[in-house]
Curated annotation (Swiss-Prot):
Matching CDD domains: LysRS_N (cd04322)
Superkingdom assignment: Bacteria
Enzyme class: ligase
Name of the encoding gene: lysS
Catalytic activity of the protein: tRNA(Lys) + L-lysine + ATP = L-lysyl-tRNA(Lys) + AMP + diphosphate
EC numbers for this chain: 6.1.1.6
Gene3D superfamilies: Bira Bifunctional Protein, Domain 2, Nucleic acid-binding proteins
Cofactor annotation comment: Binds 3 Mg(2+) ions per subunit.
Protein name per UniProt: Lysine--tRNA ligase
A GO term from the CC aspect: cytosol
Subcellular location per the Swiss-Prot or TrEMBL entry: Cytoplasm
Single GO term (MF): ATP binding
Assembly, per entry: Homodimer.
Entry keyword Protein biosynthesis: yes
Length: 524
């Protein structure tokens, strides 16, 4: 029997299927079609003002507000003529009280051999989804409670809930069975509610800045916009090799050429590469492009966007605590403006190396003595490539506060304009870092079609000399679009998953993805 169906042999599953059969024999449908006109538990809580509610006696007289809601039964205990439970929905829990003489089970025949309270005690289980009609009151201890008038079984659960104290202790099980993780852990629910809120706030900010949200193809005949290995598939209808996109960039720039002056897309990107604490092969990005901007305008947009999101999440505060660095917990302030440094300045400040004072041979020696990189990583590297390697190895993990690192070597990208100062060895690119990780990548976008072709062809020549590089053709449609004329523009890309990690104090990217990529469990 395969691992996926082992639960079919669990004693609890078998016991609950017997209950399911008995419930059906009583004439009750354990999986009804709908439960209309119910509200969220949090909405009920928001309505309540202490002095508006009476005690349980007032509820029994039906003098308190009546409510109708639904959720999962996550706690239950019998106490004589009463039984108490907790109902959990998306945002909140609420206590319910079943009473022997007052509470009824929807659909239970009047002449049934089992009473409503016995049905509740014997046929319902933790994990069942219930509809509740009842009356609000406060207990003597001050807990908001619903005296149940009618309970409706909306879904009979056949698998027991995770232990209420330890939840799902095994991380791999948590990631594979996220539904159970969400039920058992309030912190996990908060993380994913925050993720949805972050996406909403990003869209809100971009819309305020007059950006137009667009959609571009996930399946592409030519991939580009980043240095990454794609996932490859075949479109059977056209007998054509296709790729899952590794970036949103090229398609968005084509739209910019078409006259849509400010565009953004939030979407899935796929890279057939490693999996670690901050990388998943399938991840979510926002990329945005604005005509007539340069990378200075983009820097302001990025830091203001992130500050806007952080303030909305944290009641106006811009400081966030992150607990999962090797150096211990850190407080990070996302208030704009962020620290700005050129890449060379950052290597000098954080790495103690003034790269302009060293020859290429000396830079290789520094890489050999001060990093753990294999010799093949730098033995034939250009000066610009070695500067980028020194930054990666000596600087990145020291950038705890938000930084914009500007003016990268030309070799790092073929899609960016060189410095307007005339130094053609550097480009108007910045990357934003926080908590030792890259958060954003941005350019003053190259719109000279002849220079763009030259740089892409040079990139192809270098790849041809490197047996570890994967060849892929130049996107001629993109170059044709540039020939049509793309306005000067600034653009950026932000990894949404990494941003959510930072703002929810998550240790791993898997903690902010509902269903991260996992190794397949083979049949036994």
């Amino acid at each position: 029997m395969s691992a996926e169906v082992e639960y079919l042999q669990h004693e609890d599953y078998l016991y609950r299927t017997i209950k399911l059969k008995e419930i059906r024999e009583l004439g009750i449908n354990p999986y009804p079609y709908q439960y209309a006109d119910c509200v969220e538990v949090q909405e009920i809580r928001n309505r309540v003002v202490d002095n508006e509610l009476g005690d349980s006696e007032a509820a029994f007289r039906k003098e308190t507000p009546k409510v109708r809601f639904a959720g999962r039964l996550v706690l239950f205990r019998s106490m004589g003529k009463n039984a108490f439970g907790q109902i959990l929905d998306r945002d909140a829990k609420i206590q319910v009280m079943f009473n022997r003489d007052f509470s009824q089970v929807a659909g239970l025949p009047a002449d049934s051999e089992i009473s409503s309270i016995k049905f509740i005690e014997k046929k319902l289980d933790l994990g069942d989804i219930l509809g509740i009609d009842g009356y609000l009151f406060f207990t003597h201890s001050g807990e908001l409670t619903v005296l149940v008038e009618t309970v409706t079984l909306l879904c009979k659960s056949l698998i027991s809930l995770p232990d209420k104290h330890s939840g799902l202790a095994d991380k791999e099980i948590r990631y594979r069975k996220r539904w159970a993780d969400l039920i058992s852990s309030e912190e996990v629910r908060k993380t994913f509610l925050a993720r949805s809120r972050i996406l909403k706030l990003i869209r809100e900010y971009m819309d305020q800045q007059d950006f137009l949200e667009v959609e571009t193809p996930v399946l592409q005949t030519i991939y580009g916009g980043a240095e990454a290995t794609p996932f490859v598939t075949t479109l059977k209808a056209l007998h054509t090799e296709m790729f899952l996109r590794i970036s949103l960039e090229i398609a968005l720039k084509k739209i910019l050429v078409g006259g849509m002056s400010r565009v953004y897309e939030i979407g899935k990107v796929f890279r057939n590469e490693g999996i670690d604490r901050t990388h998943n092969p399938e991840f979510t990005m926002i990329e945005a492009y604005a005509a007539y901007w340069d990378y200075n305008d983009v820097m302001k947009c990025v830091e203001n966007l992130v500050e806007y999101v952080v303030r909305a999440l944290n009641n106006g505060e811009t400081k966030v605590q992150y607990s999962h660095l090797k150096s211990g917990p850190q407080i990070v302030d996302f208030k704009a403006p962020w620290i700005r440094m050129t890449m060379k300045e950052s290597i000098s400040v954080y790495g103690g190396v003034d790269v302009d004072q060293y020859s290429e041979h000396e830079l290789r020696d520094i890489l050999k003595t001060r990093t753990a990189l294999p010799e093949k990583a730098y033995v034939s590297a250009t000066r610009g490539e070695m500067i980028a390697l020194l930054f990666d190895e000596l600087v990145c993990d020291k950038l705890i506060a938000p930084h914009h690192i500007t003016d990268h070597p030309l070799e790092t990208t073929p899609l960016c304009k060189t410095l307007r100062s005339g130094d053609e060895t550097l480009v108007e690119r910045f990357e934003s870092f926080c908590l030792g990780k890259e958060l954003c990548n941005a350019y003053s976008e190259l719109n000279d079609p002849l220079q763009q072709r030259k740089l892409l062809e040079e990139q192809m020549r270098k790849k041809a000399l490197n047996p570890d590089s994967e060849y892929h053709p130049i996107d001629e449609e993109f170059l044709e679009a540039l020939c049509q004329g793309m306005p000067p523009a600034g653009g950026f890309g932000i990894g949404i998953d990494r941003l959510v990690m930072m703002l929810t104090d998550a240790a791993s990217i898997r903690d902010v993805l509902y269903f991260p990529v996992m190794r397949r469990i083979e049949s036994k």
